[in-house]
Amino acid sequence: GEKLTAGSKVYANNRNKMLVLVQVGKKDLSEGLNILGAHIDSPRLDLKPNPLYEDSGFAMLKTHYYGGIKKFQWVTMPLALHGVVAKKDGTVVKVAIGEEAGDPVFGISDILPHLAKDQRSKNINEAFTGEDLNITFGSTPAEAGSSEGEDKDLFKKNVLNILNEKYGITEEDFQSAEIEVVPAGAARDLGIDRSMVYAYGHDDRICAYTSVRAQLDLAGEVPEKTYVTLLVDKEEIGSVGATGMQSKFFENCMAEILGLTGGYDELKMRRMLSASKMLSSDVSAGFDPNYANVHEKNNAPYFHYGPVLHKYTGSGGKSGSNDATAEYIAELRKNFDENDVRYQMAELGKVDQGGGGTVAKFVSQREVD
């Protein structure tokens, strides 16, 4: 097949959920890669395999939350549906409802304040449970038929008729669908000075976009070392599965690249990974004056002070963390300072307050800095 040379640009798509961009450099791959990495999944609600039911004059959808959500944040707000429905004939139908100006939106109801005495007596985890996050999908019945049984589940039938007319899908097709429920609406400027961005999915699409943008902006040059950008799925639930960072997709891609640039062998692959360096980018927790008690001020990131470097993340005693070496942090500091990049070193909140992790720990297992 066609060989890759310095300056060649290729990409690999893993099941439409993980992307690897590669720009081949001048140096031999055994001298290492310069890698950017971010995840493209975000906390959300997923429809269950059998989501649709009706109750008391409403057509409803059951959901199963994905990732670390605060359940109470998802009630009484406009929601949109995004995803795909894979049909038995092999076709895949894209679904997007709730983003266009004329689209309907969806929602999860809450108890009105007048009747919330019992709810107020519960702690927040008891007041809002995963099984309570049911989507109000419709409230108009279909016309009843004349035959026996045709007057049942009329609210459910009506929404199914609409879905079939618009998308050609049936109730059974939900079983092979991946439909996500997310906050409806486009990104907007936040603040009278328009200094911030109000949007769903900052975690981690803000880093995914900037990583891709960085590689595309350098597409016209031939780098010394090979550039790689990794956009991965399933970070919010542990980087698992065939499209998460724990999969073999990244290594498989680089094995193909080695094969197309002079020949694959296992030792060269190991040397390449060991000599590689990565910036694993994910969101941090900026200091919020409304919740100052969860931050330790000397080690909190602040607005206006540039991107944040975390030497480690994790929780408690750095559990579940990648702890970058002091030498690598020093190298990054030198590069940023020499290029007049403003940055800050920080931690993710107070010790024992919570914590978090990202894909770095899985990449570092390949002996990547």
Task: Locate predicted features.
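N-terminal hydrophobic/helix-forming segments and targeting peptides
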Residues: 1-369
